[in-house]
Amino acid sequence: MRVTAPRTLLLLLSAALALTETWAGSHSMRYFDTAVSRPGRGEPRFITVGYVDDTQFVRFDSDAASPRMEPRAPWIEQEGPEYWDRETQTSKAQAQTDRENLRIALRYYNQSEAGSHTFQRMFGCDVGPDGRLLRGYSQSAYDGKDYIALNEDLSSWTAADTAAQITQRKWEAAREAEQLRAYLEGTCVEWLRRYLENGRETLQRADTPKTHVTHHPISDHEATLRCWALGFYPAEITLTWQRDGEDQTQDTELVETRPAGDGTFQKWAAVVVPSGEEERYTCHVQHEGLPKPLTLRWEPSSQSTIPIVGIVAGLAVLAVVVIGAVVTAVICRRKSSGGKGGSYSQAASSDSAQGSDVSLTA
């Protein structure tokens, strides 16, 4: 697998763009790579998508009529031809590497070539409000299961099974972690800063959630209170229910944050309560777009209608995202670790944001 120079882009930066401001919160850049074999139907398909925070900004699909890295956000379209040529070549090289990884994995697991198999990788970096590295990561999976991951120290690996231990020993002998760490601490951070600057109006905005509580009778004795948050960005949000001031986490049904289809997100949290005791329950909402946390109660006189159309649209978009980017099977645990971010006066136009100096095969 390649790593430096995913499933998880850098440009010539002028001195005038040196990072001096701070951002409201932490930010991330991730690339998600997926290679899927299809016996009897040609080479494995390879897809890579890049995200800054919750926004997809680039995509490459080897099955396209003319495979190229393509823009998926307005702010990335300003990049010049050299950028797109470089990212396309990096993606094509990674496609070949991951196809080889599929063949290697078949040998490691003693599997037949008759079946379809999947090799995935997610890699990238997080920066804090000051633009400095919080954490770098690189995780691989085979057939939907963890395979090998770079540890938080960016110097060692965790292998999921005996097959992955073969890869671990190979990479340790080649000192691959050192090269990957150089990418994560340098190029990755520099590109992320660049993107945050160019996409400031989109990526660094904070859309306030629209909130309300709905009431759904279950029986004569119980009802469901559902706390809604709609139209917010970024996706990070906290919804909690309390009864007489006591947290009800264990009894709360909480759905995953889902895209609304317009660049914002939706979420709800629900609790089942005894009929007649609704006033004892409060929903608490925390989000970057709120000046202070909100406290909501169900108001019987202002019963809200559930926005079914909006929710269904959100689910439809979510399905497209999941199907179109299978890559999200590899999950990143966000934990902070110290690191230094570089000045982006050093962002070299010859470096790919995805990394291109190292080719890592399992």
UniProtKB/Swiss-Prot annotation:
Which keywords label this protein? Disulfide bond, Glycoprotein, Immunity, Membrane, MHC I, Signal, Transmembrane, Transmembrane helix
Residues on the membrane's Extracellular side span: 25-308
Q: Supply the SMART domains for this chain.
A: IGc1
Region of interest (Alpha-3), ranges: 207-298
Q: Where is this region: Alpha-1?
A: 25-114
Q: One Pfam match, by short name?
A: MHC_I_C
For region Disordered, the annotated ranges are: 335-362
Q: Which residues cross the membrane?
A: 309-332
User: Might you report a single GO cellular component term?
Assistant: recycling endosome membrane
Q: Which sequence ranges are listed under topological domain Cytoplasmic?
A: 333-362
Positions of glycan attachment? 110
Q: Known InterPro entries for this protein?
A: Ig-like_dom, Ig-like_dom_sf, Ig-like_fold, Ig/MHC_CS, Ig_C1-set, MHC_class-I_related, MHC_I-like_Ag-recog, MHC_I-like_Ag-recog_sf
Topology term for the membrane:
Single-pass type I membrane protein
Q: How does it assemble?
A: Heterodimer of an alpha chain and a beta chain (beta-2-microglobulin).
Function in brief = Involved in the presentation of foreign antigens to the immune system.
This chain belongs to the protein called Class I histocompatibility antigen, Gogo-B*0102 alpha chain
Species name: Gorilla gorilla gorilla
